[in-house]
Amino acid sequence: MPEVSLYNYTMSICSMKTRLAMEEFGVDYDDKQVDIGFALENFEPDYVRLNEKAVVPTLVVGDRVVTNSYNIVLEAAKLGKVGIPADPVENKAALDWFQKGDQVNFQVITYGHKGVPRGDELLIARRERAKEYAEKYPELRSIYQAAHDRIVEHGNCAYDADTVAQAEVDLQKRLDELDAHLADKPFIAGSNYSIADIMWTVLLARIEMLNMTAWISERPNLLAYYQRMKARRSFETARVMPNWKGGI
């Protein structure tokens, strides 16, 4: 297997998904931390040349670069040759629920619930850094300008009450559906752990981090499932965080 490096940040929800995939699917990797807090390391030129969106995570496999946690989890399953069931029914369930989790707007929910310490200040700092670097590095201006515009749009959405409320409604519908789905299954796809469990273990941990645990505990099948996932060794080794740790 070629050398594998994962650029990530401990408290990033998307980074947690990829670390959990690496641990569960048995992929050895070099853990490269990129501080996306006030250090703003994700805006440094060397990093944006790897990931033009200036976000984490980023996976490098040999000379290939894979961005977006969705793609990285799939790549980890491919490298580990596990996580995507061969059985057609379980395969469909794994992919369907993996996609359903990815569609939930947890970024808006997290910032809307003030889940990131000094989150308001951080968004301003990111916006200003992108603007500054667009002038400082003219060869990368279009990348930094696009990053600036995404940060502005994210801030507008994250602090719009209607947008946050709709994201919460969408999430609760998914949780109801998943609770019913888990009535007779140890894992989301069925009898085998899959990419769907990667996705939802991390999303449920984020719900806990946001002090919204009632959304889990009031759904008995979901609660039992989450407890099983938390008991897996990978939950700790992948640093899936149900509570905020450290600064920003």
From Swiss-Prot:
Pathway: Xenobiotic degradation; pentachlorophenol degradation
Ranges for domain GST N-terminal: 2-84
Entry's EC annotation: 1.21.4.5
GO process annotations (BP): pentachlorophenol catabolic process
pH dependence (record): Optimum pH is 6-7.
Family: Belongs to the GST superfamily.
Pfam families in the cross-refs: GST_C_2, GST_N
Organism, as annotated: Sphingobium chlorophenolicum
Function: Sequential reduction of tetrachloro-p-hydroquinone to monochlorophenol, using glutathione as the reducing agent.
Reactions this protein catalyses: 2,6-dichlorohydroquinone + glutathione disulfide + chloride + H(+) = 2,3,6-trichlorohydroquinone + 2 glutathione; 2,3,6-trichlorohydroquinone + glutathione disulfide + chloride = 2,3,5,6-tetrachlorohydroquinone + 2 glutathione
Assembly behavior: Homodimer.
Gene from which this protein is expressed: pcpC
InterPro entries: Glutathione-S-Trfase_C-like (IPR010987), Glutathione-S-Trfase_C_sf (IPR036282), Glutathione_S-Trfase (IPR040079), Glutathione_S-Trfase_N (IPR004045), TCHQD (IPR044617), Thioredoxin-like_sf (IPR036249)
Protein name per UniProt: Tetrachloro-P-hydroquinone reductive dehalogenase
Residues of the GST C-terminal domain: 133-248
A GO term for molecular function: glutathione transferase activity
Induction trigger: Constitutively expressed.
Keywords: Aromatic hydrocarbons catabolism, Oxidoreductase
